[in-house]
Amino acid sequence: AASSDRDISSLAEIMAGGAARPPDQVGKISSTFKRASPGIGYGLTETNALGAVNAGAFYVANPRSTGRVVPAVTDFRITGEDGKTMPAGERGEVCIKSPANVVGYWNKPEATAEAFVDGWFHTGDVGYMDDDGFVYIVDRIKEIIIRGGENISCIEVEAAIYSHPDVVEAAVFGLPDERLGEIVGAAIVLREGAQMTAEALREYLAEHLASFTLPAHVWFRSEALPRIASGKIFKRQLKADYAAELAGAR
């Protein structure tokens, strides 16, 4: 957009939400646009989109964080499996209390009782908060890959993949494995004209990630990754398609 002939002088902010933005994209936005600053928000339908916000210089300095809690109207806490609040830096489930929270799910009393406890909405997201109050979303609880007992965040692996200059789109997901339970799979779209092998990708990622988190299976696609109506990548479809492909190859 910055290199086009369109007049974007009135553009003041470039906000994102619904999914993590590749960290290096934040710096590119800041350096490319003279006036517009990047930002990201975290919230859910159940909280009427209220949660945390990261914008401007704070976001550029801390691009992996979804920001600080929206003041006055929102309380945040990170809880462990025992329901107790986790200390700074420790991962757990993100819970939000706010007068903007919905009261429950229509005609779904069991789901309501599970998600809304003592005024706190249990988001189903894994995250943590640092000593300065910045919130970090690690992944959905349901999307954490458990490989041989080790927890792997899809979002963290995706961030490492996106740091490669030839990567345009990436999605990471768990695939069934008889020995380890789950293994890491990745679907990737490269920039036009770029070429890469799975082994070359793993060598690059090994400089940024623990060895057990590296993708065991990598698919390079010529077409864009499928997306749902909200614009999020349709991981469930990718996971089903590639799991079926692997099962058929056995």
Language-model-derived ranges and their functions:
Residues 1-61, 71-75:
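Gly/Ser/Thr-rich phosphate-binding loop
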Residues 13-16, 172, 219-220:
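Hydrophobic/anchoring residues in structured secondary elements
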Residues 18, 43, 67, 125, ...:
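Active-site glycine-centered loops adjacent to acidic/histidine catalytic or metal-binding residues
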Residues 20, 54, 60-107, 115, ...:
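Adenylate-forming AMP-binding core of the ANL superfamily, especially NRPS adenylation
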Residues 24, 28, 93, 98, ...:
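AMP-binding/adenylate-forming catalytic core of the ANL superfamily
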Residues 39, 218-221:
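General small-molecule cofactor/ligand-binding pocket signal
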Residues 240-250:
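Acidic/polar alpha-helix N-cap and adjacent early helical turns
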